[in-house]
Protein backbone atom coordinates (compact mmCIF):
# COMPACT_ATOMS: atom_id res chain seq x y z
CA UNK A 1 0.00 0.00 0.00
CA UNK A 2 1.30 3.41 -0.93
CA UNK A 3 0.48 6.24 1.44
CA UNK A 4 0.33 9.82 0.21
CA UNK A 5 3.26 11.94 1.27
CA UNK A 6 2.60 14.27 4.18
CA UNK A 7 3.08 17.97 3.63
CA UNK A 8 5.29 19.65 6.18
CA UNK A 9 5.35 23.40 6.68
CA UNK A 10 8.78 24.33 7.97
CA UNK A 11 8.68 27.24 10.39
CA UNK A 12 11.99 29.04 10.93
CA UNK A 13 13.09 29.93 14.43
CA UNK A 14 11.19 33.05 15.41
CA UNK A 15 12.70 36.05 17.12
CA UNK A 16 10.93 39.01 18.65
CA UNK A 17 9.21 41.36 16.18
CA UNK A 18 8.92 45.16 16.48
CA UNK A 19 7.04 46.95 13.69
CA UNK A 20 5.70 50.47 13.26
CA UNK A 21 3.56 52.05 10.56
CA UNK A 22 3.06 55.80 10.07
CA UNK A 23 -0.71 55.95 9.69
CA UNK A 24 -0.59 59.72 10.23
CA UNK A 25 1.22 60.28 6.93
CA UNK A 26 -0.59 57.50 5.03
CA UNK A 27 -2.97 58.96 2.46
CA UNK A 28 -4.47 55.81 0.94
CA UNK A 29 -5.53 55.79 -2.67
CA UNK A 30 -8.83 54.21 -3.66
CA UNK A 31 -7.02 51.07 -4.82
CA UNK A 32 -5.02 50.81 -1.58
CA UNK A 33 -8.01 51.25 0.70
CA UNK A 34 -10.18 48.75 -1.18
CA UNK A 35 -7.35 46.20 -1.26
CA UNK A 36 -6.77 46.68 2.46
CA UNK A 37 -10.40 46.07 3.36
CA UNK A 38 -10.56 42.97 1.15
CA UNK A 39 -7.58 41.60 3.11
CA UNK A 40 -9.18 41.59 6.57
CA UNK A 41 -12.03 39.60 8.12
CA UNK A 42 -15.61 40.81 7.47
CA UNK A 43 -16.30 41.60 11.13
CA UNK A 44 -13.21 43.84 11.23
CA UNK A 45 -14.32 45.58 8.05
CA UNK A 46 -17.64 46.34 9.75
CA UNK A 47 -15.88 47.61 12.87
CA UNK A 48 -13.52 49.90 10.93
CA UNK A 49 -16.42 51.21 8.87
CA UNK A 50 -18.03 52.54 12.05
CA UNK A 51 -15.20 54.96 12.86
CA UNK A 52 -16.24 58.58 12.54
CA UNK A 53 -12.77 59.91 11.74
CA UNK A 54 -10.40 58.80 8.97
CA UNK A 55 -7.35 58.71 11.20
CA UNK A 56 -8.97 56.24 13.58
CA UNK A 57 -9.98 54.03 10.64
CA UNK A 58 -6.47 54.13 9.15
CA UNK A 59 -4.83 53.24 12.47
CA UNK A 60 -7.20 50.32 13.07
CA UNK A 61 -6.69 49.07 9.50
CA UNK A 62 -2.91 49.24 9.86
CA UNK A 63 -3.12 47.28 13.10
CA UNK A 64 -5.15 44.48 11.52
CA UNK A 65 -2.85 44.26 8.51
CA UNK A 66 0.24 44.13 10.73
CA UNK A 67 -1.22 41.26 12.75
CA UNK A 68 -2.09 39.25 9.64
CA UNK A 69 1.34 39.95 8.13
CA UNK A 70 2.95 38.75 11.37
CA UNK A 71 0.99 35.49 11.48
CA UNK A 72 1.42 34.79 7.75
CA UNK A 73 5.16 35.44 7.64
CA UNK A 74 6.32 34.25 11.07
CA UNK A 75 3.98 31.27 11.60
CA UNK A 76 3.66 30.32 7.91
CA UNK A 77 -0.14 30.27 8.06
CA UNK A 78 -1.65 31.28 4.70
CA UNK A 79 -3.19 34.76 4.85
CA UNK A 80 -6.68 33.58 3.94
CA UNK A 81 -6.53 30.81 6.58
CA UNK A 82 -5.76 33.16 9.46
CA UNK A 83 -8.56 33.51 12.00
CA UNK A 84 -8.30 36.33 14.50
CA UNK A 85 -10.59 36.66 17.49
CA UNK A 86 -10.95 39.04 20.43
CA UNK A 87 -10.81 38.26 24.12
CA UNK A 88 -13.52 39.40 26.53
CA UNK A 89 -11.36 42.50 27.08
CA UNK A 90 -11.22 43.18 23.32
CA UNK A 91 -7.61 42.10 22.79
CA UNK A 92 -6.92 40.61 19.32
CA UNK A 93 -5.67 37.01 19.51
CA UNK A 94 -5.06 34.13 17.14
CA UNK A 95 -7.92 31.61 17.19
CA UNK A 96 -7.14 28.63 19.44
CA UNK A 97 -7.69 26.09 16.67
CA UNK A 98 -5.01 27.71 14.49
CA UNK A 99 -1.90 25.72 13.57
CA UNK A 100 0.71 27.41 15.76
CA UNK A 101 4.16 25.92 16.44
CA UNK A 102 4.70 28.32 19.36
CA UNK A 103 2.30 27.56 22.26
CA UNK A 104 3.29 30.78 24.05
CA UNK A 105 3.21 32.97 20.92
CA UNK A 106 2.09 36.43 21.97
CA UNK A 107 1.53 39.72 20.19
CA UNK A 108 0.10 43.10 21.03
CA UNK A 109 -0.62 46.31 19.12
CA UNK A 110 -1.20 49.95 19.97
CA UNK A 111 -1.94 53.09 18.02
CA UNK A 112 -1.89 56.69 19.12
CA UNK A 113 -0.57 59.89 17.62
CA UNK A 114 0.87 59.23 14.17
CA UNK A 115 1.81 55.55 14.47
CA UNK A 116 0.47 52.05 14.83
CA UNK A 117 2.96 49.67 16.48
CA UNK A 118 3.23 45.92 17.03
CA UNK A 119 5.36 43.76 19.30
CA UNK A 120 5.43 39.95 19.13
CA UNK A 121 7.35 37.21 20.94
CA UNK A 122 7.44 33.42 20.46
CA UNK A 123 7.81 32.65 24.19
CA UNK A 124 7.21 35.83 26.21
CA UNK A 125 4.14 37.59 27.54
CA UNK A 126 4.09 40.98 25.79
CA UNK A 127 2.28 44.31 25.99
CA UNK A 128 2.97 47.46 23.98
CA UNK A 129 1.89 51.08 24.18
CA UNK A 130 2.78 54.19 22.19
CA UNK A 131 2.16 57.77 23.29
CA UNK A 132 2.71 61.04 21.46
CA UNK A 133 3.78 64.05 23.49
CA UNK A 134 1.22 66.79 22.91
CA UNK A 135 -0.19 69.74 24.81
CA UNK A 136 -3.50 69.21 26.64
CA UNK A 137 -6.55 70.11 24.60
CA UNK A 138 -7.87 72.34 27.37
CA UNK A 139 -6.29 74.18 30.28
CA UNK A 140 -2.66 74.56 31.27
CA UNK A 141 -0.13 71.80 31.85
CA UNK A 142 -0.25 72.26 35.66
CA UNK A 143 -4.05 71.93 35.50
CA UNK A 144 -3.71 68.80 33.37
CA UNK A 145 -1.24 67.30 35.85
CA UNK A 146 -3.60 68.10 38.72
CA UNK A 147 -6.42 66.20 37.00
CA UNK A 148 -4.10 63.22 36.44
CA UNK A 149 -2.56 63.36 39.93
CA UNK A 150 -3.84 59.95 41.05
CA UNK A 151 -2.37 58.12 38.06
CA UNK A 152 1.22 58.32 39.33
CA UNK A 153 3.07 57.89 42.62
CA UNK A 154 4.74 60.76 44.47
CA UNK A 155 8.15 59.58 43.27
CA UNK A 156 6.98 59.47 39.66
CA UNK A 157 5.60 63.00 39.94
CA UNK A 158 8.94 64.13 41.37
CA UNK A 159 10.65 62.76 38.26
CA UNK A 160 8.09 64.34 35.92
CA UNK A 161 8.22 67.74 37.60
CA UNK A 162 11.99 67.59 38.08
CA UNK A 163 12.52 69.26 34.70
CA UNK A 164 12.25 73.02 34.32
CA UNK A 165 10.48 73.31 30.98
CA UNK A 166 6.90 72.11 30.67
CA UNK A 167 7.41 70.31 27.36
CA UNK A 168 10.01 68.00 28.93
CA UNK A 169 7.61 67.43 31.82
CA UNK A 170 4.98 66.34 29.30
CA UNK A 171 7.56 64.07 27.68
CA UNK A 172 8.18 62.33 30.99
CA UNK A 173 4.45 62.16 31.73
CA UNK A 174 3.70 60.30 28.50
CA UNK A 175 6.75 58.07 28.88
CA UNK A 176 5.49 56.97 32.31
CA UNK A 177 1.98 56.53 30.91
CA UNK A 178 3.21 54.29 28.07
CA UNK A 179 5.08 52.10 30.57
CA UNK A 180 2.01 51.62 32.75
CA UNK A 181 -0.23 50.89 29.78
CA UNK A 182 2.25 48.34 28.37
CA UNK A 183 2.18 46.42 31.66
CA UNK A 184 -1.62 46.50 31.91
CA UNK A 185 -1.96 45.31 28.32
CA UNK A 186 0.56 42.52 28.92
CA UNK A 187 -1.40 41.13 31.87
CA UNK A 188 -4.71 41.73 30.08
CA UNK A 189 -6.71 43.25 32.92
CA UNK A 190 -8.00 46.33 31.10
CA UNK A 191 -9.79 49.09 33.01
CA UNK A 192 -9.99 49.00 36.77
CA UNK A 193 -6.33 48.40 37.64
CA UNK A 194 -5.13 50.96 40.19
CA UNK A 195 -2.24 52.72 38.43
CA UNK A 196 -0.66 53.94 41.67
CA UNK A 197 0.15 50.31 42.47
CA UNK A 198 2.76 50.59 39.72
CA UNK A 199 5.88 52.70 40.11
CA UNK A 200 8.58 52.96 37.46
CA UNK A 201 12.16 53.94 38.21
CA UNK A 202 13.18 55.48 34.88
CA UNK A 203 16.68 54.95 33.55
CA UNK A 204 18.15 56.67 31.66
CA UNK A 205 16.16 59.89 31.89
CA UNK A 206 17.03 60.85 28.31
CA UNK A 207 16.36 58.46 25.42
CA UNK A 208 18.00 58.79 22.01
CA UNK A 209 15.81 58.35 18.94
CA UNK A 210 16.21 54.92 17.35
CA UNK A 211 17.81 53.23 20.37
CA UNK A 212 16.18 50.68 22.68
CA UNK A 213 16.78 50.73 26.43
CA UNK A 214 15.98 48.16 29.14
CA UNK A 215 17.18 49.69 32.40
CA UNK A 216 13.85 50.99 33.72
CA UNK A 217 12.59 48.98 36.71
CA UNK A 218 9.05 48.23 37.87
CA UNK A 219 7.85 48.23 41.47
CA UNK A 220 4.43 46.71 42.18
CA UNK A 221 2.94 47.55 45.57
CA UNK A 222 6.41 48.71 46.63
CA UNK A 223 8.21 45.48 45.64
CA UNK A 224 10.54 45.28 42.65
CA UNK A 225 9.23 42.95 39.93
CA UNK A 226 12.46 41.46 38.60
CA UNK A 227 10.75 39.03 36.22
CA UNK A 228 9.52 41.93 34.09
CA UNK A 229 11.61 43.74 31.48
CA UNK A 230 10.64 46.96 29.73
CA UNK A 231 11.98 48.04 26.37
CA UNK A 232 11.78 51.79 25.88
CA UNK A 233 12.38 53.68 22.65
CA UNK A 234 11.55 56.84 20.76
CA UNK A 235 10.44 56.31 17.17
CA UNK A 236 10.80 60.02 16.54
CA UNK A 237 11.04 63.25 18.54
CA UNK A 238 7.48 63.01 19.87
CA UNK A 239 6.55 59.30 20.14
CA UNK A 240 7.48 57.07 23.10
CA UNK A 241 7.03 53.30 22.86
CA UNK A 242 7.13 50.91 25.81
CA UNK A 243 7.17 47.11 25.49
CA UNK A 244 6.54 44.97 28.59
CA UNK A 245 8.04 41.45 28.56
CA UNK A 246 7.68 38.49 30.92
CA UNK A 247 8.02 34.73 30.71
CA UNK A 248 4.63 32.97 31.07
CA UNK A 249 5.84 31.14 34.20
CA UNK A 250 7.00 34.40 35.76
CA UNK A 251 10.68 33.41 35.91
CA UNK A 252 13.50 35.78 35.15
CA UNK A 253 14.60 35.75 31.51
CA UNK A 254 17.51 37.02 29.48
CA UNK A 255 15.72 40.23 28.46
CA UNK A 256 15.79 41.42 32.08
CA UNK A 257 18.95 43.53 32.38
CA UNK A 258 21.59 43.03 35.01
CA UNK A 259 22.49 45.86 37.35
CA UNK A 260 25.45 46.97 35.20
CA UNK A 261 23.63 46.65 31.85
CA UNK A 262 23.47 50.29 30.80
CA UNK A 263 23.91 50.02 27.03
CA UNK A 264 20.96 50.20 24.64
CA UNK A 265 20.07 47.02 22.77
CA UNK A 266 19.49 46.79 19.02
CA UNK A 267 15.92 45.43 18.82
CA UNK A 268 14.76 48.55 17.02
CA UNK A 269 11.41 49.12 15.38
CA UNK A 270 11.20 48.45 11.67
CA UNK A 271 9.17 51.16 9.95
CA UNK A 272 6.82 49.56 7.42
CA UNK A 273 5.16 51.15 4.40
CA UNK A 274 1.84 50.11 2.86
CA UNK A 275 3.50 47.75 0.37
CA UNK A 276 5.14 45.99 3.33
CA UNK A 277 1.77 45.63 5.06
CA UNK A 278 0.14 43.85 2.12
CA UNK A 279 3.20 42.00 0.76
CA UNK A 280 1.70 38.64 1.84
CA UNK A 281 -1.96 39.64 1.59
CA UNK A 282 -4.62 37.57 -0.16
CA UNK A 283 -7.96 39.31 -0.87
CA UNK A 284 -10.73 37.38 0.87
CA UNK A 285 -13.90 39.29 -0.07
CA UNK A 286 -15.27 40.98 -3.20
CA UNK A 287 -14.43 44.62 -3.84
CA UNK A 288 -16.82 47.05 -2.13
CA UNK A 289 -16.63 50.53 -3.73
CA UNK A 290 -19.06 51.94 -1.15
CA UNK A 291 -16.44 51.40 1.56
CA UNK A 292 -14.17 53.88 -0.22
CA UNK A 293 -17.03 56.33 -0.71
CA UNK A 294 -17.79 56.29 3.03
CA UNK A 295 -14.11 56.69 3.90
CA UNK A 296 -13.79 59.76 1.66
CA UNK A 297 -16.49 61.55 3.64
CA UNK A 298 -14.79 61.08 7.02
CA UNK A 299 -12.79 63.93 8.53
CA UNK A 300 -9.08 63.55 9.24
CA UNK A 301 -8.52 64.49 12.89
CA UNK A 302 -6.06 63.20 15.50
CA UNK A 303 -6.78 59.93 17.25
CA UNK A 304 -8.10 60.52 20.74
CA UNK A 305 -5.53 59.94 23.47
CA UNK A 306 -5.60 56.38 24.68
CA UNK A 307 -7.15 54.90 21.54
CA UNK A 308 -6.05 51.27 21.12
CA UNK A 309 -6.66 48.61 18.54
UniProtKB/Swiss-Prot annotation:
Recorded superkingdom: Eukaryota
Major enzyme class: transferase
InterPro entries: 4-PPantetheinyl_Trfase_dom (IPR008278), 4-PPantetheinyl_Trfase_dom_sf (IPR037143), AASDHPPT_N (IPR055066), P-Pant_transferase_sf (IPR050559)
Cofactor annotation comment: Binds 1 Mg(2+) ion.
UniProt entry keywords in alphabetical sequence: Cytoplasm, Magnesium, Metal-binding, Phosphoprotein, Transferase
Catalysed reactions listed for this entry: apo-[ACP] + CoA = holo-[ACP] + adenosine 3',5'-bisphosphate + H(+); apo-[ACP] + acetyl-CoA = acetyl-[ACP] + adenosine 3',5'-bisphosphate + H(+)
Record flagged with keyword Metal-binding: yes
Residues modified as Phosphoserine: 258
Biological process per Gene Ontology, one example term: lysine biosynthetic process via aminoadipic acid
Enzyme nomenclature, EC number: 2.7.8.7
Cofactor annotation: Mg(2+)
Gene Ontology CC: cytosol
Chain positions recorded as CoA binding sites: 47, 86-91, 108-111, 181-185
Location (main, coarse): cytoplasm
Signal peptide residues on this chain, from the entry's feature table: none
Binding-site residues for Mg(2+), renumbered to this chain: 129, 181
Localization: Cytoplasm, Cytosol
Molecular function GO labels: holo-[acyl-carrier-protein] synthase activity; magnesium ion binding
Protein function: Catalyzes the post-translational modification of target proteins by phosphopantetheine. Can transfer the 4'-phosphopantetheine moiety from coenzyme A, regardless of whether the CoA is presented in the free thiol form or as an acetyl thioester, to a serine residue of a broad range of acceptors including the acyl carrier domain of FASN.
Family statement drawn from the similarity comment of this UniProt entry: Belongs to the P-Pant transferase superfamily. AcpS family.
Subunit structure, as described in the record: Monomer.
Name the record gives this protein: L-aminoadipate-semialdehyde dehydrogenase-phosphopantetheinyl transferase
Organism encoding this protein: Pongo abelii
Amino acid sequence: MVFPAKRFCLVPSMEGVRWAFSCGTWLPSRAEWLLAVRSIQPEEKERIGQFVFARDAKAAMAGRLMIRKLVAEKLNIPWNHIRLQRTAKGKPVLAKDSSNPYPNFNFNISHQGDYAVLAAEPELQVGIDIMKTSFPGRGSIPEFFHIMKRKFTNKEWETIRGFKDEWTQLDMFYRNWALKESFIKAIGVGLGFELQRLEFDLSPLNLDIGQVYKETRLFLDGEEEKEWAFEESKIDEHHFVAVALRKPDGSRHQDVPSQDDSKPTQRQFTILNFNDLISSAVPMTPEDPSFWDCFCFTEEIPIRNGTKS
